Amino acid sequence: IGAAAGASFSSSAIEAGSLLFLTQFNSADWSGDLLAFDLAEDGTVATVANWSAKEQFSDDYFDDPTTATRVAYTWDALAGNGVLMKNSLGTTDLLADYQVDPDGSSEAPATDKATARLSYLLGSRTQEAPASAYDFRARNADSIMGDIVHSKPVYIGDPNLNWPDDGDFDYGAGNLYSDFKSAAAGRAGAVYAGGNDGALHAFDADTGTELLAYFPGHLANTAGASGYHYLSDPDYGHHYYVDGSPVVGDAFVKASTAGSAAWRSVLIGSDRAGGRGLFALDVTDPSNFLGTSSKAAQVVLWE
């Protein structure tokens, strides 16, 4: 078990109620964990974690991942917007990826195996080896959480930057940064980290419940030992996916070219060792992370 990424904190100054977030990975089976610990004002770290993402991702975490309550998004490059991951068989690049077998062969569109592989990526264990029709890679017996190696978690609480309300830029009535800070004050804290299970994960900072999984569409690849299909390869060695540390800032931007500019908290994610891609998510309000197509299009800004 190892840890390569640095720790993160829920506040810029150590105070009562502060949390420390640590990541781990196990190179024996490439499982991972994100843990939250209470942090005392004197800097003492609790010996027992408040929560563990690995435990949240236990066997009974998912019912039927393709239809249940897990919120997962991806990017449809052709449409130019975010979509629900469970609907990604309708995206050209991802479907081609799901159809690739370890030997490099591909199957016809809309095959049962592509559907099964998507369900596997979303957490289903029904097709894991040895007792399955497809013998996909068996993940850690206790959890499907993948390794987090270089991605340092980032905590997002209340907006706390100091953008001025005055200046040369006309924000318009009700669009001042001070208005945004007031409106977003008290929003639920969330912690974000990239995983080599293919997704950037968002967790409720207090409970560890997963709020969102984002599978970047640009990571789709039909090459061997690459792409999302490789995660299900029974001979999987290791591959990096969302390996970069997410960064977050408040920006006065449009959600789309046709939309209106507004203050938003924007997360920029990257692949690091996993590739050369970037993506942006609107993380202003975690309560917007819902399993609807409209929310997927709203939250995912671009890749």
Tell me what each language-model feature is.
Residues 1-303:
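A fold-level detector for beta-propeller and closely related beta-sheet-rich head/sensor domains
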